[in-house]
Amino acid sequence: YDGEEGVCYHFTYGNALFIMLNSESMRSAEGLAAAQAWVRDVIKSNPAKYVVVMEHYQWFFGESGRTSQYGRWKDLFDECGVDLAIGANNHIYARTNAIYQGRETDGSKGTVYIQTPSSDNERGQGLKEWTDNKDLIKFRWTEGGSTVGAILLRADDSKLHLTLYDRNGNALDSVSVAAKR
């Protein structure tokens, strides 16, 4: 969208629409509104079996569970049927099951929110007391300051499958996101 060409973008890969957002341009209310209008239009104009939205900042703060970008995007994701939201930034893996209207669902509607862990062995951080969103966040993981983790995303006709691996290739968590279209 205007001023964000090459920074905010989208593409279709197989049967999934991927939307990438510029977190820095969304700090102001005007920037957030422009980004949300663009996301709404991209989803409407690019029908796909799965919709995945990615941005740099976390949906929840992994160390405590406190809400971060989730509060700014959840209503739009509910409205547009976003299947998977991937964020990062605080380098602690955190995952929800499908959430719709602020509550966990059976997966037939709602968005799964995931924060990716650190992958460079330098930017991890430790967990703190889990104070918020215990009903929404289903799994958290970090190795502390030297975290290395990776997420494998596979897709088939009925589900997206995500698996978290540690530095030694051990599977630590997995979630499947049901196709809703």
Write out the residue ranges for each language-model feature.
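Short, solvent-exposed loop/turn segments at secondary-structure boundaries
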Residues: E30-G31, E63-T67
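Active-site glycine-centered loops adjacent to acidic/histidine catalytic or metal-binding residues
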Residues: H56, A88-N89
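Short beta-strand edge segments in extracellular beta-sheet folds
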Residues: A178-K180
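Short acidic, glycine-rich surface-loop motifs adjacent to enzyme active sites
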Residues: N46-E63
